[in-house]
A protein has these predicted regions:
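Long amphipathic alpha-helical segments used for membrane anchoring, targeting, substrate engagement
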Residues: 1-30, 80-104
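Residue-level signature of catalytic and energy-coupling elements of molecular machines
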Residues: 10, 46, 70
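Small cofactor-carrier domains centered on a conserved lysine used for covalent cofactor attachment
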Residues: 25-28, 32, 37, 59
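Conserved functional loop/turn residues at catalytic and ligand-binding sites
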Residues: 28, 41, 52, 73, ...
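N-terminal intrinsically disordered, cationic/polar leader segments
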Residues: 32-52
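A short interface-forming secondary-structure element
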Residues: 51-63
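Stable alpha-helical structural segments in soluble proteins, enriched in small hydrophobic residues
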Residues: 69, 73-84
Length: 104
């Protein structure tokens, strides 16, 4: 691959990476637990945006259950964000980079 093509490829990859970052920033992914009593929202980068808890999920006698519900909802949302990020990164990589098969 000549240097001009390599520089062009690098520039395109940088532009595509910026667009990917914008998509990740603009996307909200949700996780829930307890039949929807606890919901967590994250952006495509995995930053926690918020947690919503219905009052029916709050039992002062069973705080551990609520803690588990929150953790489960957040983990589900984070897993969705990780899947989205990995898919977006896969789209960025050209299929024919020599010497780096199966990078993603």
């Amino acid at each position: 691959m000549d240097m001009g093509k390599l520089m062009s490829l690098q520039k395109k990859m940088m532009e595509d990476a910026e667009k990917m970052q914008e998509r990740l920033d603009a996307t909200t992914l949700d996780g829930s637990s307890g039949g929807g009593m606890v919901k967590a929202s994250v952006d495509g980068n995995g930053h926690l945006l918020g947690v919503t808890i219905q009052k029916e999920a709050v039992d002062p006698e069973d705080v551990e259950m609520l803690q588990d519900l929150v953790v489960t909802a957040v983990q589900e949302a984070l897993e969705k964000a990780e899947t989205m990020r990995a898919d977006e990164q896969r789209k960025l990589m050209p299929a024919n980079i020599p010497g780096i098969p199966g990078l993603f």
